[in-house]
Amino acid sequence: MLFRSGALQLLLMTQPHRKTVRLGIKKVFQDGRRRVFVWLKQFAQMQLGEKELTASPLGPPSALTPKPGRQRDPAKKLAGWNLAEAEETRELITALGRSGRPILIGPWLSEAGFELIYWIPFLAWAKAYGNLDPSQLVVISRGGAASWYRDITTNYEDVLSFYSPDEFRVRNEARIVEQHGRLKHVEICSFDREIIAKVSEKRGLSGVRLLHPSTMYRLFDHFWFQRVPITLIEAFTSFAALPPVDLGDLRGGLPERYVAAKFYSNTGLPDTPENQAFVASYLEELTRHIDVVLLNTPHRFDDHSDIAKANRGRIHTIDHLMTPANNLDVQSRVIAGAEAYVGTYGGFSYVAPLLGTNALTFYSHITGFRFDHLELAKRVFSGLRKGSFVELDVRSVDLIRLGFGALHDEFVAKG
């Protein structure tokens, strides 16, 4: 006991000296390494005829830096890069790129918001990192989202070409139960395997490899559960605007100028009498200035129901143009051709700024959505500089009107 006590006292007494020695050794090592790098650079310059070495051109500005559009120092590793899931993801993507086999991507079965700001940018990163051949890739999604993936690959299969909307909803709900209530696609479930088998059979594929959404979810869970900062998302995504689409054969059935509108109920804008009254009043006021095209769909794929109803005059509907397998394509084209987009704040509203259309969205319950998804989306939109995006509490609408002088006459009358 006396010996251990004396040893501890000796360690405490010599701690400052040992720290000084450690720092000195570290400084000597760093100085030596710096001198070696300088010597290597000078040697390389002599071998290249004394030409000054220049750095490789930087990639495109990041959408997620504290100031959007700023360049990151390429020599710095972003937080989260060395996570076990990060290393597994890089190894998987590298193996897929070297496999020489067909690669099925998906199936994507859940909400559009995550698909737009996480899944598709993650795939863009994976394609570049693994040097994936677009001809080897087959994307599987639902609802006619092929145009969203055009920069990844033109090979696309739609789940709703294999299942009716009711079958899809029932099977997707069973998938959620199989995942113990989790909506996010965190596991490869029996429904996934069935879809993969159908796609493989249709295309005559064998020995396929799979890039499943669960890979992304396992990795990005560290950000969503606030274990690491947003730099994890930056390290494993490549953000870009959606590929351009045009109205095409839809043009003849639409007004020359219009605003696209999609009001549906969710936890941020629930289907209450107050919200129904707000939407009806807002659309009535909007149609005094411009035609409105409602993006209501005739089919129900999840627990979201439309709030806005067609009534008369300058409000137009396009539900007769949509099928289960093309509804996202039709809505995307209508949004791309619109003067602006208005509607419920939610994941679908991200389509508008990603297609270059300005968006004004509404919510009534601020506790009905997560701010981290909204913050990331707004940073992406600001960095891309395509379409602007505004989310507004319905209680603030009158304040905005006042700010622009719309209520001036009422205040004069009251005075």
Model region roles, listed by residue range:
Residues 1-2:
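Short, small-residue-biased leader/transition segments that mark boundaries at the very start
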Residues 86-95, 100-204, 330-333, 348-351, ...:
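Active-site and donor-binding regions of nucleotide-sugar-utilizing enzymes
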Residues 101-104, 258, 340:
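Structural motif
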